[in-house]
C-alpha cells in the first residue's frame, strides 16, 4: 500500500451529493470515517468519528443531504464524488409510503405493500434497503420479502424469505438475518421450475399477509417486496403473479420504461406504478461475479465472517437414515400422466433422491415438514447443510452443518441445484 493510501484522503461533499467507490481486490480493505456533517449509506446514518470497514466486492455510495467530510483509507478500484443522484426521488417514495402508513394506522388497516421491480443490476435491493431504513428511522416495523432466488438478500440463493425489520441496517453487514421465514425453491432462477416458484411465492405471501394482523405496528407499516431481475416473458408473468399474491398497492420500476408501461397496462388502476431512475453508481455484475457472490453468501452461512466467525460441524449420515427428496419430477406428456393429473402437477411432485456421488457439493434444505405426506412446498425451512462427501462403499454421506450431529428426528432434506465447494481451512 502506498503512503498516500496509508495516510488516507479527505473528501468534502456538498449537499445532495454522494461519494462512490468500489473494491474488487480480494484482500483489499477500505476504512471510512465521517469527520463532520451528516451522511448515510443506503438509508443508514453514519456515526461521527466511527471507522467503517469495507472489503472485496463492496460497491459503496455514501450520500449527504446537508454536506459532510469523509476520511477514506485503503485501496479502491474506483472512487469519485457525484452530484447526479436519485436519492431525492427515493425519499419522495418513502414519503408517499408514509402517507399510506399514517392512513392505515388511523383506520386500523393493512399498511402499503410496495414492490421494487426492474432488470438485473439496477439497484433493486439497494432501493429496498433505503426504503426499509427510512421506515424504521421514523418508528415503523415493516416486513421485508425477498423473492430474488438468484442472489438472495435474506437467505442463501434458491429460496424466498421474509424478515421483520426493527432497526436500521448495519453499515457494514446490512440487516440482521435473525428469525427469517424461508421457503425452499431449489433453483437459481424462477425458470428452473416456474410452477413451483409461483407456488412458494403464493404461500409466503399468504403467511406474510396473515402475520401482519398479529402486531398493530407491523400491520400499518406494510411490506417492501424485492423481486428477480427477469422481467420479460415468463419473468414478467411472475412479477404479475407476485403483485396479485401480495396485493401490491405500489410498484416502483427501476430504469425500464418498457416494463413501466406494461405494468400500467396490466395491473389494476388502483395500483400506483412509479418509474424511477437507477443510481449512476450501480454497476453491472458479470456472471462470474454473481457466482462469487452466491458462493460468498453460502460460505458466510456456514462460517460467518471476520467480525463474527462460525464453526460448523461435519458428520456422517447413513444412506438408510437419509430422508432426501426433490420437488419436481421430470416432465411427462399428458398421455402418460395418471387420470386427473396434468403435466404441471409433476412440477410440484415430491420425489425421493437416491444418494450418489453426483450429490457432492449440493446444498440441502432442512424442512420443518416431518413427512412427504405433509405440505412440503408450503412448509418453511429450518436451515441448510451441504454434502461434502459420498462414500458408496460404506453407504454414508458427510454433511457440513451449522448444528452438531445428529440430524433432528424425522429430518426431511430437500435437494437444491446450488453447490458449494467447501475449501475453508
Curated annotation (Swiss-Prot):
InterPro entries: Clp1, Clp1/Grc3, Clp1_C, Clp1_C_sf, Clp1_N, Clp1_N_sf, CLP1_P, P-loop_NTPase. HAMAP family: Clp1 (MF_03035). GO terms for molecular function: ATP binding; polynucleotide 5'-hydroxyl-kinase activity. GO terms for biological process: mRNA 3'-end processing; tRNA splicing, via endonucleolytic cleavage and ligation. This is Protein CLP1 homolog. The lineage of its organism: Eukaryota, Metazoa, Ecdysozoa, Arthropoda, Hexapoda. GO terms for cellular component: mRNA cleavage factor complex; tRNA-intron endonuclease complex. It comes from Drosophila pseudoobscura pseudoobscura. PANTHER family: CLEAVAGE/POLYADENYLATION FACTOR IA SUBUNIT CLP1P, POLYRIBONUCLEOTIDE 5'-HYDROXYL-KINASE CLP1. The keyword Nucleotide-binding applies.
Amino acid at each position: 500500500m502506498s503512503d498516500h493510501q496509508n495516510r488516507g484522503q479527505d473528501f468534502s461533499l456538498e449537499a445532495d451529493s454522494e461519494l462512490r467507490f468500489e473494491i474488487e481486490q480480494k484482500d483489499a480493505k477500505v476504512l471510512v470515517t465521517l469527520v463532520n456533517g451528516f451522511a448515510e449509506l443506503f438509508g443508514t446514518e453514519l456515526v461521527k468519528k466511527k471507522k467503517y470497514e469495507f472489503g472485496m466486492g463492496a460497491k459503496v455510495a455514501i450520500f449527504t443531504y446537508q454536506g459532510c467530510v469523509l476520511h477514506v483509507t485503503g485501496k479502491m478500484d474506483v472512487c469519485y464524488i457525484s452530484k447526479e443522484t436519485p436519492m431525492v426521488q427515493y425519499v419522495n417514495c418513502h414519503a408517499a409510503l408514509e402517507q399510506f402508513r399514517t392512513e392505515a394506522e388511523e383506520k386500523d388497516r393493512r399498511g402499503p405493500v410496495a414492490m421494487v421491480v426492474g432488470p438485473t443490476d439496477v439497484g433493486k435491493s439497494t432501493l429496498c434497503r433505503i426504503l426499509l431504513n427510512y421506515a424504521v428511522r421514523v418508528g415503523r416495523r415493516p416486513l421485508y420479502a425477498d423473492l430474488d432466488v438468484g442472489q438472495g438478500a435474506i437467505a442463501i440463493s434458491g429460496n424466498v424469505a421474509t424478515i421483520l425489520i426493527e432497526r436500521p441496517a448495519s453499515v457494514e453487514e446490512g440487516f440482521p438475518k435473525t428469525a427469517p421465514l424461508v421457503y425452499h425453491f431449489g433453483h437459481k432462477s424462477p425458470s428452473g421450475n416456474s410452477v413451483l416458484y409461483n407456488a412458494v411465492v403464493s404461500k409466503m405471501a399468504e403467511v406474510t399477509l396473515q402475520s401482519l394482523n398479529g402486531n398493530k405496528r407491523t400491520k400499518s407499516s406494510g411490506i417492501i417486496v424485492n423481486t428477480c431481475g427477469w422481467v420479460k416473458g415468463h419473468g414478467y408473468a411472475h412479477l404479475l403473479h407476485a403483485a396479485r399474491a401480495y396485493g401490491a398497492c405500489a410498484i416502483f420500476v427501476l430504469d425500464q420504461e418498457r416494463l413501466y408501461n406494461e405494468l400500467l397496462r396490466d395491473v389494476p388502476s388502483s395500483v400506483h406504478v412509479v418509474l424511477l431512475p437507477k443510481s449512476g453508481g450501480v454497476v453491472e455484475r458479470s456472471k462470474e461475479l454473481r457466482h462469487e457472490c452466491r458462493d460468498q453468501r453460502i460460505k458466510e452461512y456456514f462460517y460467518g465472517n471476520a467480525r463474527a466467525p462460525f464453526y460448523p460441524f461435519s458428520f456422517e449420515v447413513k444412506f438408510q437414515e437419509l430422508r432426501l427428496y426433490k420437488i419436481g419430477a421430470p416432465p411427462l406428456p399428458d398421455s402418460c400422466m395418471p387420470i386427473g393429473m396434468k403435466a404441471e402437477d409433476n412440477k410440484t411432485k415430491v420425489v425421493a433422491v437416491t444418494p450418489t456421488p453426483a450429490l457432492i457439493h449440493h446444498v440441502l434444505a432442512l424442512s420443518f415438514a416431518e413427512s412427504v405426506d405433509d405440505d412440503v412446498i408450503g412448509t418453511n425451512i429450518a436451515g441448510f447443510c451441504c454434502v461434502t462427501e459420498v462414500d458408496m462403499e460404506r453407504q454414508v454421506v458427510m454433511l457440513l452443518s451449522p448444528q452438531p450431529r445428529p440430524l433432528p428426528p424425522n429430518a426431511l432434506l430437500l435437494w437444491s441445484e446450488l453447490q458449494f465447494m467447501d475449501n475453508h481451512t
